[in-house]
Regions:
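Short, surface-exposed, charged loop/turn segments at secondary-structure junctions
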Residues: 56-67, 107-121, 143-144
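Small-side-chain structural scaffolding
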Residues: 42-45, 93, 102, 123, ...
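A mid-sequence, solvent-exposed acidic-amphipathic segment
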Residues: 122-165
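Polar/charged alpha-helical tracts
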Residues: 22, 27-28, 56, 107-110, ...
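A short linear-motif detector with a strong N-terminal bias
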Residues: 20-23, 73-74, 108-109, 132-137, ...
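Zymogen propeptides
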Residues: 1-86, 92-97
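Hydrophobic, well-structured mid-protein blocks that either form specific transmembrane helices
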Residues: 86-139
């Protein structure tokens, strides 16, 4: 279902999980779980926040769609959706329809062609996406200090020719 390998680039150790786009399933793990403590494998794909320390309702701040539907159920205190249907930070998304993978500028999942209501579709928005930018390595190197002590940085890379993620 996936292959794993490790590489080093500019002093940073990269742990790479490669799979077909059809295997991707964005999910909301809530506060009761985290990726390490779950039965899932993958990466943290988006930004989120919690409105109260004692509730289980994260506000998802990027597009996050699985099976053609937003993965969450949150709203903010202005009753605006924070369920993965819209991006409030970042304005690009990667999406897969079951046969086509693409990327585009979008802040609402309904704007992604072939995603809404499609049981085979997924979409993930993000803040620092360099979609279609030939200089993406330079952009990432400027954004990430490889000498910092931060752990857990994650990224999604897609190959539109092979539908590999």
């Amino acid at each position: 279902m996936y292959t794993y390998h490790k590489a080093t680039e500019n002093g940073m150790t990269l742990h790479i999980i490669e799979t077909d786009a059809s295997n991707i399933r964005p999910a909301q793990l809530l506060k009761t779980s985290n990726l390490k403590g779950s039965n899932e494998y993958g990466i943290n794909g988006g930004w989120y926040t919690s409105t109260k320390p004692d509730d289980n309702n994260y506000n998802i701040l990027n597009i996050a769609v699985s099976g053609g539907r937003p993965v969450g159920g949150g709203v903010n205190n202005k009753n605006e959706p924070r369920d993965g249907s819209v991006s409030t930070v970042g304005k690009h998304a990667i999406f897969y329809t079951g046969s086509y993978m693409g990327y585009m500028e979008a802040t609402n999942y309904e704007d992604l062609p072939g995603v809404k209501g499609n049981s085979r579709a997924w979409a993930q928005g993000g803040v620092a996406m360099s979609l279609g930018n030939q200089n993406w390595v330079s952009v990432v190197n400027k954004a990430v200090d490889v000498n910092s002590d931060h752990e857990g940085l994650s990224a999604i890379v897609v190959n539109l020719d092979t539908n590999k993620v």
